[in-house]
């Protein structure tokens, strides 16, 4: 089966595992998924990220994070720019997700950045997803 939107698939797998309160999630690896997973770890949405190399494409293992009473750290994930409708923004028009409580993941000329990092570096780009 041909996957037309691997980013949306990755976000959906995280959302589903999060709703089911799974501790670990494994997805087929790609550079963009590694970048998104690293941002999620850096911003504190997941505990840890491991990349397992094999002879094929590799696997990304994401360790989901939950609060003290089992509440989810990731409330929701939303794909913004899709293959059928790309969404680009300038640095001055960069969206704030829930007034800064969430993050936007932006693909820029300097790689994947959060909305805050893109604003600081004065770089626009393609808004891939919102996470809060």
UniProtKB/Swiss-Prot annotation:
Native source species: Streptococcus agalactiae serotype V (strain ATCC BAA-611 / 2603 V/R)
GO molecular function: rRNA binding; structural constituent of ribosome
Domain of life from the UniProt record: Bacteria
Gene Ontology biological-process entries: translation
Known partners and oligomeric status: Part of the 30S ribosomal subunit. Contacts proteins S5 and S12.
Protein's recorded name: Small ribosomal subunit protein uS8
NCBIfam families reported for this sequence: PRK00136.1 (NF001109)
Top-level taxonomy: Bacteria, Bacillati, Bacillota, Bacilli, Lactobacillales
Keywords: Ribonucleoprotein, Ribosomal protein, RNA-binding, rRNA-binding
Protein family (similarity comment): Belongs to the universal ribosomal protein uS8 family.
One Pfam match: Ribosomal_S8
One Gene Ontology CC term in the entry: ribonucleoprotein complex
InterPro entries membership: Ribosomal_uS8, Ribosomal_uS8_CS, Ribosomal_uS8_sf
Function: One of the primary rRNA binding proteins, it binds directly to 16S rRNA central domain where it helps coordinate assembly of the platform of the 30S subunit.
Gene that this sequence comes from: rpsH
């Amino acid at each position: 089966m041909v996957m037309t939107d691997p980013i949306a698939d990755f976000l959906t797998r995280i959302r589903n595992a999060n709703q089911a309160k799974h501790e670990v999630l494994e997805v087929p690896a790609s550079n963009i998924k590694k970048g998104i997973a690293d941002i999620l770890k850096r911003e504190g949405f997941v505990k840890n990220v491991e990349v397992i190399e094999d002879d094929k494409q590799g696997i990304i293992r994401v360790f989901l994070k939950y609060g003290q009473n089992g509440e989810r750290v990731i409330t929701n994930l939303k794909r913004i720019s899709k293959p059928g409708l790309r969404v680009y923004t300038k640095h001055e028009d960069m969206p704030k997700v829930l007034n800064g409580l969430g993050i936007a993941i932006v693909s820029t000329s300097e790689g994947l950045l959060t909305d805050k990092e893109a604003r600081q570096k004065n770089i626009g780009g393609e808004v891939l997803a919102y996470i809060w």
